From Swiss-Prot:
Enzymatic class: isomerase
Binding site for substrate: 109
Similarity comment: family membership: Belongs to the tRNA pseudouridine synthase TruA family.
Identification of the protein by name: tRNA pseudouridine synthase A
UniProt keyword Repeat present: no
A Pfam family of this chain: PseudoU_synth_1
Assembly and oligomerization: Homodimer.
UniProt keyword terms in alphabetical order: Isomerase, tRNA processing
Length: 261
């Protein structure tokens, strides 16, 4: 039997999604909890691996099991065995052809910026703090140059393992709500550090250190060293994964919870 789960987590205590020897990860905690409920070893496959300190409200995973359980066992039962900063949001029995990663047609991330002179006390692990007068409108205008299929070599991590640097960005929106700025980006898939590198570049433009035409120049250069520093991890959320409608997966509010969808 193949089971799909919707997962959310606060990534600050973990060395990313992927299971690793000698360090804690979201995957390891989830597999441990699922194995207890199933009474057999469980290995999960995710829609997209997140880095250390990165959060998710819309991660999707699937796993194979011989255990026959009620849906409540895969939600409430698993949650009882998880740390407080990881939670199952929904469960769905899926066809054997479904794959959390390969069946996905798009992923969506939100990057939350707290733009104020002084650091935040509340939500400090869920936003990235940047001082200065950040122009969200010019960031939004500049961000439209990322839409479409491009070679994102200038916006991938130096050790990114993807075989191709090409990705198709479906939409990017930058909005401000008081002291909070949200960079919302959807694409068919993302390269390692791609969202944070895009945000770092948009911040340089929003702060007035660069002009919007810098973006097409960076895309043409295909040189990571020429772009802005990578934005901090703690403001980044994986908020949604898109699948064909035939799978009938649940759709919940994107989050993070303090955002209005």
């Amino acid at each position: 039997m193949r089971v799909a789960l919707g997962i959310e987590y606060d990534g600050r205590q973990y060395f990313g999604w992927q299971r690793q020897a000698e360090v804690d990860s979201v995957q390891a905690q989830l597999e441990r909890a699922l194995s207890k409920v199933a009474n057999e070893p469980i290995r999960v496959h995710c829609a997209g691996r997140t880095d250390a300190g990165v959060h998710a409200t819309g991660q999707v995973v699937h796993f194979e099991t011989n255990a026959i359980r009620k849906d409540s066992a895969w939600t409430l039962g698993v949650n009882v065995n998880l740390p407080d900063d990881i939670a199952v949001r929904w469960v769905k029995i899926v066809d054997d052809e479904f794959h959390a990663r390969f069946s996905a047609t798009a992923r969506r991330y939100r990057y939350m910026i707290y733009n104020y002179d002084f650091r935040p006390g509340i939500l400090r692990s869920g936003v990235s703090h940047y001082r200065g007068n950040i122009d969200a409108d010019i960031m939004h205008q500049a961000a439209q140059q990322f839409v479409g299929e491009h070679d994102f070599t200038s916006f991938r991590a130096l050790h990114c393992q993807s075989k191709t640097p090409f990705r198709s960005v479906h939409e990017v929106n930058v909005t401000r709500q008081g002291m909070y700025i949200c960079v919302d980006i959807k694409a068919n898939a993302f390269l390692h550090h791609m969202v944070r590198n895009i945000v770092g570049t948009l911040l340089e433009i929003g702060l007035g250190n660069q002009r919007p035409e810098w973006i097409p120049q960076l895309l043409d250069l295909k040189d990571r060293s020429q772009a802005a520093p990578t934005a901090k991890p703690n403001g980044l959320y994986m908020v949604d994964v898109t699948y064909p409608e035939r799978y009938e997966l649940p759709k919940l509010a994107l989050g993070p919870l303090f955002m209005l969808d």
